[in-house]
Every structure is written in C-alpha cells, then in structure tokens.
Design a protein with these regions (language model features):
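Flexible, solvent-exposed loop/hinge segments and secondary-structure transition points
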Residues: 23-163
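Hydrophobic h-region of N-terminal signal peptides that target proteins for export
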Residues: 13-21
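General helical structural elements
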Residues: 9-10, 92
Length: 163
C-alpha cells in the first residue's frame, strides 16, 4: 500500500509542472481557408461586374498558396484571359498585395515564374485574415481591378461575420 502511494505521489509531482507551465508557443497553427462556394461567388460577381461595364473577362480565385480555388470565363472572352487571370490572382496572393501596387516598385519580379505585374490582381483579406487572391483579365487593367474588387465586395457581408 505504501509503495502505491509513493508511486502515485512521484507521478503527481513529476507531471504537475507539465500542466502548470505549458509551452509558450502553440503547437498548432490555424489557418482560414475560403469555402468553395465563397470562391465561386467572388469569380461570378467579378465577371458579372465586368459584363455590366461592357467587358468580357475571365476571373480566378487562388488560395493563400496560389492554388486555383475557383475560375469563371465568359464564353466570349479571349482565350488569353484564362492564363492571365490566374497569374494575376497568383501574383496578388503570393505577394499579398494588389498587382497595381507591386508593378511600379518591383519590376525585378517580372522574371519570377507565374508572377504577372499587370493591374487586375487583388488579395482577399477579411477581418485581418488573409485568404488568397482574385485576378481578372479581359478589360482594361484598371477595370480588371475594379471588377476584382467587386467580386470581393460581393462576399464581404458574409465574411465580416465569420468567427
């Protein structure tokens, strides 16, 4: 009996500090990812906004790592808009800023693979969380950016209340 109490006491005293003094850093990093239906709403709203402005475009959404999450092409838009919209989205996501803000400052990045420094790529941020990027191609570059912003705006009300 005495031996069991002694062993229990030893284990208790040995394990107690582990609970009282946990590591300062969390062992898990939590990331937020756009649900597929939100990514689809963004590209749909971006393409529709450009149609209202009189332009036929493609729109792409990529996740935080630059992987394609959603894509929509107006059937009458040029075939080149497929690749260009993806590259604009990739550029804004991986550099985490609008392509319109990168281009004047970082021409050296024009040689990086899949980076396209043409206006029309916008990062997707809500409530301080980064989700990825959206790129639009087929209109004038300044209009592409406005349509990308319209795509983000279309889901902003939903995303503002995400916990």
């Amino acid at each position: 009996m005495y031996s069991i109490k002694k062993q229990f006491l030893f284990l208790f005293l040995f394990l107690l500090p582990l609970k009282l003094f946990p590591d300062e850093k969390e062992p898990i990093i939590q990331l937020r990812v756009l649900a597929h239906h939100i990514a689809h709403k963004i590209v749909h709203a971006a393409v529709e906004d450009c149609v209202k402005r009189g332009y036929l475009v493609s729109a792409a959404v990529v996740d935080r790592n630059g992987n394609l999450a959603a894509f929509l092409r107006n059937p009458l838009s040029g075939v080149h808009t497929i690749k260009v919209s993806k590259q604009k989205a990739f550029s804004s996501a991986t550099l985490r800023t609008k392509t319109s803000e990168i281009a004047p400052r970082r021409s050296d990045l024009s040689f990086a693979p899949d980076i396209l420094l043409i206006v029309g790529g916008v990062p997707i941020n809500f409530t301080g969380n980064f989700y990825g990027g959206v790129g639009v191609a087929g209109a004038r570059p300044d209009i592409d950016e406005l349509c990308a912003l319209a795509g983000i705006e279309a889901v902003s009300e939903i995303m503002e209340f995400v916990d």
